[in-house]
Amino acid sequence: MGFLIKVPTPRGVPLQESIRNLFFHVPMWFGMNILFIVSFIYAIKYLRSPKQEYDAYSLEFARTGTVFGVLGLITGAIWAKYQWGAAWSGDAKQNGAAIALLIYFAYFVLRGSLNDEEKKSRIGAVYNIFAFFMLYPAIWILPRLTESLHPGGQGLSLIHI
């Protein structure tokens, strides 16, 4: 989107097209993270007090977070094609984000495969918690331990033992 809409960039600063990425790609990931945190909280609430309302909130926040994640991947691929020459470079953060989203897609498949509503809600809440705990290593921890094209991805070379 930022490549289709003319977003003004500061003159004389070598950021060029990178600055536009901050208006679309980065907010998608922050939105995804916030929505997954809220979904995680409602999954815990459901397990503590099994109200269908908590399950519905947990599911819908996860769905919306997944939409933001997919949009983050798409906008990142557009930007990567422009900046790095390839939409998918196999970067650790790209791969981690794709794996994390696949884990959440499996959450929706799991919920869709169960017929008993109570069982669907309970198993879904447990899996949602699992998915949340897989999300942060996949997109925040592991990419920082390896070389990455993304900012902050210098890997273990920054750690001096």
Residue positions per predicted region:
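Conserved small/polar residues in nucleotide/adenosyl-binding loops
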Residues: 159-161
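Membrane-interface helix-boundary motifs at transmembrane edges
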Residues: 48-60, 114-121
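Transmembrane alpha-helix entry/boundary detector in multi-pass membrane proteins
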Residues: 19-30, 58-63, 83-99
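Alpha-helical transmembrane segments of multi-pass membrane proteins
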Residues: 1-11
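Membrane-interface helix-loop-helix modules in multi-pass inner-membrane proteins
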Residues: 67-112
